UniProtKB/Swiss-Prot annotation:
GO terms for biological process: neuropeptide signaling pathway. It is found in: Secreted. It comes from Austrophasma gansbaaiense (Gladiator). GO terms for molecular function: neuropeptide hormone activity. Belongs to the pyrokinin family. The modification Leucine amide is found at L16. It comes from the Eukaryota. One of its GO terms (cellular component) is extracellular region. InterPro entries: Pyrokinin_CS. This is CAPA-Pyrokinin. Keywords: Amidation, Neuropeptide, Secreted. Myoactive.
Length: 16
């Protein structure tokens, strides 16, 4: 959970 897309919470992008 470092600002990526995990679960159903994509805050920034795929995996930043």
């Amino acid at each position: 959970s470092s600002g990526g897309g995990e679960g159903s919470g994509m805050w920034f992008g795929p995996r930043l």
